[in-house]
Amino acid sequence: IMAGVPAISLEKHLARIIAEQKYTVVLIKQKGIPPNVTRYLDTVVSPGTNFDFVLDQDENNITSLLIDQIRGIYLVGYSAIDVTTGKCYYNEVHGTSEDKFFALDEVFNYMNMHKTNEIIVSFADKNINQKEVLDYLELSLKTFHIGHFRPKISYQNELFKNVFNIQSLLTSIEHLDMERVPLSTESLAVLIDFVIGHDSNIIQKLSHPQKLDVSRYIYLGNNALEQLNVIETTHN
């Protein structure tokens, strides 16, 4: 879809479009004085990388998941950036022989605890049943992309060094205390690379990644807040 709007009303229209959670908007601006006018790519705005054009001030997380499996048991590296504040989170979860879907359940909970508007899903094993994972995480209800970028350790270290301004004798991954969570470091590298490709300004305010402390939360599933009449439903 191509559209043009008066410059004075750009923010209003763009906020409404992004709020639909369906579209990635490419902003083409022009510079110069007619007839010597040139057009250039200014910004790429997607649901997860939007922080300038918002209808409310709620958190807006873009999330990256790296999914692996061992003998049918799922392992997930999770990372997320709240583009409104620059806060960065990560965790790595492994399933068990008793519950092979445990890791998927955990990241599903993470995405419900932290308002998630866009997701990049990467698969470490080509034999993973991708449809099973996407359906289990109910990603058809969100904006998501299948990622194919698999950054090497050397790339991750250099990327983190530049983004987080790390000056240390340790590797960047060690400095961030993430050497024991390789799925999470790769997930975070994929996420940062994606964000830079959309709007590099977001990276300038990025804080050091924090391990997600799930012990601070209780997850209320199955629309529990609505069922308990804590919040109103749209049809009430």
Describe the predicted segments one by one.
Residues 1-236:
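Charged catalytic and DNA/RNA-contacting regions of genome-maintenance
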